[in-house]
Each structure stands twice: as C-alpha cells, then as structure tokens.
Amino acid sequence: MHRTTIPLIVAVLTVSVALRCMGQDTESLPAREAKAASIDELLLFFPSKFPDGEWKPKDLQFQDVFFVAEDETKLHGWYCPANAPRAVVLVAHGNAGHVASRAPWLRFLQTKAKVSVFMFDYRGYGRSEGTPTVEGALRDAKAARAKLCELAAIKDTEMLLMGESLGGAIVIQLAADSPPRGLILQSTFSSLRDVADVHYPKLSWLVPGNKLDSATQIVRYRGPLLQSHGNVDRTIPFSSGEKLFRSANEPKQFVTIEHADHNNWVTDAYLNQLDRFLARVSEAQK
C-alpha cells in the first residue's frame, strides 16, 4: 500500500467531517466534488498509467492481454506462461504502480518459481481504462480470473491466487466465492477499518466496517494458505496480518519476514517458503 495513503486519508476525512458538521451531504455535491470526497477512489488507489514505466522489460516472456469486466470496462494484463509450469497463478498487485512496475517479480515467478502467471491492472491503472474503485477492482479481478481460465485452459478452481497488500484483500474475496488450489497473501490487512484504527483512530468510524473486511471473508475459504508479513511493516501493521491469519482455516502457514517493512518482503527466506508451498500444492494436485 502506498505510504502517502495515511496523510491523504486524514486530510480528506477531515473535509468529510467538516461537511457533515455544516450539515452538507456529500451526495448533494456535484459529481466531481463527490468523487473528491470518495475514500475508495482517492484514498486507496494510487495508479500509474501507461506509458510511464518500462513496458518492454528484458528477459520476460509475456503476452499483452486485453479483456473486459462485467460492466464492459476495458482491462489489460500480462500473461507470462512458463515452460512445463507446476502451477498457474493469478496475481493482484497493490494499490500503486502497474504490471510493468512488477516485471522483476513476474520474471522470478516465471523463470525461478516455474509457474505461469497472469497479472492484471485494475481499472485506471496501466493500460486499463476507467476509474479505480473497490467495487470495480473486485469486478476486474473476477474478469481476470475468467480470462486466465481461457488462457491456460483450466478451471478457476485449478489456479492459485496471489495478492500483495490491497491485492490480498481482492483475491481473498475471489477465494471466498470459489476456492482456488491455493491462496498466497503478502502484507495484507485484516480490514480497511482496522488499518484506520491504527493510523487515525478518531476518524476511523468514517470507514465502513464491511469495507474490504478480509478477516470475515477469509473464513469462507477452505484450502491451503501461505501468508507472509514483515514484522516492521509501518503501512499495514504486523498485528493486522496476524489477525487475518487467525481468522483463516487450516491448512495454513504464516511466514514472518524479519526486519521487513511493507515493500521489501522479497527475501531468500520467504522465497524458500514460497517454493515449498508451491511444491506441496502441486504435488497434492497429482
């Protein structure tokens, strides 16, 4: 999750409080102003757009994939098939950047982890059209999952779901609706309200309690889980990750990444655990 999220949240929520105190309903504001007070669109999403970034990375074999969400929003992602893959993985990234900014991670998954991977951009990110919202991101993920079924010629229950930070909350919803072969979460929160309680407790009541309530949704998923979190994460508290993990069903594994903040969780120790998890899930499928 983008580090500047927190001060931005405080600023916009303060405006929201002021409007309520003055008796002005944000629903009555013009569309542009109402969006300016939208927690979903301005406080959670920090998209980067094409052509910013390196869109022709070296040593990564990928296909540009264009597809549409249920509401006809045009979306884009990179499909990176591996030779003789041991698994197929759908990846939902965090709330900043785009697929091109994750090229090194995609390269690792394809060449080292030996999995075929499809990473998509939420609406408003990269080459995907539209404006990002929570509801839209969930629709986008659902459409991406269906597209990966087509690309890899598999059922949705045969793929693994992987999510980083915000992306973890997105794939938890997918897993709750239709269980995948396995679920991999990195630096993911228990709920948006819980994060708000830590960073701005006096204003956290403005965040709906059911907004990305992953701890409640993950109860509906029954299958293998690998969850990891840096123990000095200053963006999503380590305790939030622990709370999410406690809510999950077995079989599950929690990996504490020592001395890791929110974005530097890719360590040799974690990659070793990821490799073992992929091996177990792949073997169980045979």
Where in the sequence are the language-model features?
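Membrane-embedded segments
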Residues: E70-K147
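Short alpha-helix in the alpha/beta-hydrolase fold that links the catalytic acid
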Residues: W105, S214, G223, P237-R246
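Hydrolase active-site cap/lid region
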Residues: G168-G223, T267
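Short beta-strand/loop motif that positions the catalytic acidic residue
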Residues: R220-R222, Q227-H229, D233
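Acidic catalytic loop of the alpha/beta-hydrolase fold
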Residues: N231-I236, N263-N264
